[in-house]
Design a protein with these regions (language model features):
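Non-transmembrane, aqueous-exposed alpha-helical and coiled segments at domain scale
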Residues: 106, 112-113, 168
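Zn-dependent metallopeptidase/amidohydrolase metal-coordination segment
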Residues: 121-153
Length: 168
């Protein structure tokens, strides 16, 4: 919902950018079964044109302190391309016009994808590879499917930042 905060609890971040694929130890910190299920569900098996998505678990202890009952929990897709990777059509059609519909309907062991943003999977993945704890909290400012947006989100973000800092 608009103005809600989305946290990934002990849930996951999914990177569409392929960033972690360039680092040693990637398979040790990623949820390979989730990745395989998602790629198969999306019909991307064998597609060498798409960066292999990776899935990172959030730090459970840190996220348990921050993501309380006032936050929506789920899987966040980090799609740095902003346009096509987030299902936005320009004057060029998407390679898979049902991409967002598939993403919305995807479920794996009770995990559902709740939102898109652009960099949290890289932050979570690199942190895990370096032995750090990290989590991110996103402010939902638009719902493209419902064609709703929160144009006055700046004040809400300040409140969310304060809430997260108090919970750390």
């Amino acid at each position: 919902p608009i103005k809600s905060s989305a946290a990934s609890d002990v849930y996951k971040r999914q990177g569409f950018d392929g960033l972690l694929n360039f680092y040693a130890g990637r398979n040790e910190v990623c949820d390979l079964d989730f990745e395989k299920a998602f790629i198969q569900y999306m019909g991307w098996t064998g597609n060498t044109c798409i960066a292999h998505p990776y899935v990172i678990d959030e730090d459970p202890e840190l996220t348990a302190r921050i993501a309380q009952t006032d936050m929506v929990k789920g899987v966040t897709i980090a799609a740095g391309g902003f346009f096509g990777p987030q299902g936005r059509e320009l004057r060029i059609p998407l390679a898979d016009p049902k991409q967002n519909e598939k993403i919305e309907n995807f479920e794996y062991k009770g995990y559902r994808i709740t939102n898109f943003e652009m960099e949290s999977s890289a932050l979570a993945g690199l942190s895990r590879l370096m032995g750090h704890k990290a989590t991110t909290v996103c402010m939902v400012i638009a719902n493209r499917l419902a064609k709703e947006a929160n144009s006055g989100y700046q004040n809400t973000i300040d409140t969310l930042i304060q809430k997260v800092l108090e919970r750390i």
